[in-house]
A protein has these predicted regions:
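Active-site core of glycosidic bond-cleaving carbohydrate-active enzymes
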Residues: 31-47, 51-273
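An acidic-aromatic substrate-binding cleft motif
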Residues: 1-36, 43-50
């Protein structure tokens, strides 16, 4: 019976819902964008109630900084930025469009969305990739966290490539944000903006495939850095940066070798599966 799994899953969700969503009900008790997106989707499935989800998205909108970035957790006592986490806020809005279709609610957030995407655009390097926008937690201005996985313990969840330069995952997340934002803009009747976002996403796809792959076409953790992760293969597939046929080969390779390839954590497993 799946009943015990259902019970513990629902109980976990409830424990992480107070005046905000929380990454954990005991320790940090912070509303993180990546964590909250998964919790919101679960909430939609079990209740159809979007009140706390709306508040969550409004919270992150209010955390917008002068450069367009959002806090990765909010409410929060001070600046706390993971650039890639701003994309999960865009995904929340796309999810809300798919489940509820509330145009008025979405319109309120579009200025914030454009600010996020402009931040990434301004930080493209000469190759057309998202440049080095962050680094290690507590040492650099922003934290290029991707996932808590064993291979990245020493860099606090950042691919080692981030020690030397840009990381591929931030370019893939930016592409994902552009594609989902384009869908929302088109739904709101802003077709020219949607077209612009898709053109930018296509340019990014070409840059990633030119500079962030090895001789076989598998995605590297950073341009010229011979380290690999499941994460890059997953997000290359999710963004149609790689063909389904090749993407399957690369992903299966990571599934069969958990030593060579950094593995997705439970939290990132949603995107893997």
């Amino acid at each position: 019976s799946l009943a015990p799994i259902w019970d513990i899953s629902l109980r976990t969700l409830k424990r992480c819902m107070h005046e905000t969503y929380e990454d954990c009900p005991f320790y940090e008790q912070l509303q993180y964008a990546m964590d909250s997106r998964s919790q919101i989707l679960y909430t939609y499935m079990v209740s159809g109630d979007d009140r706390l989800a709306r508040k969550c998205m409004d919270d992150f909108r209010r955390s917008a900084r002068y450069d367009g970035m959002l806090n990765c957790s909010y409410p929060c006592y001070g600046p706390n930025v993971i650039p890639g986490f701003a994309v999960y806020y865009i995904l929340m809005l796309h999810d809300h469009m798919m489940y509820f279709g509330d145009r008025e609610f979405l319109r309120i957030h579009m200025g914030t969305v454009d600010g996020i995407l402009e931040y990434f655009r301004r930080n493209l390097d000469e190759r057309g990739l998202v440049g080095k926008v962050g680094g290690l937690n507590g040492r650099d201005r922003y934290w290029s966290f991707i996932d808590w996985t064993k291979q990245w313990d020493q860099t606090s969840g950042m691919p080692h490539a981030g020690l030397y330069g840009p990381i591929t995952m931030e370019s893939l997340l930016y592409r994902l944000g552009l594609l989902r934002a384009a869908d929302v803009m088109e739904y709101l009747g802003r077709k020219q903006v949607a077209e612009e976002y898709r053109e930018r996403a296509e340019s990014l796809k070409k840059a990633v495939n030119t500079f962030c792959t090895d001789e076989e076409g598998m995605y590297l953790d950073g341009p010229g850095v011979k380290e690999y992760s499941q994460h890059c293969q997953v997000f290359a597939l999710l963004t149609d940066t790689v063909t389904v046929e090749n993407g399957r080969i690369y992903l299966e390779r990571t599934l069969s070798d958990s030593v060579t390839y950094a593995q997705c954590s439970v939290a990132m497993g949603y995107y893997l599966f």
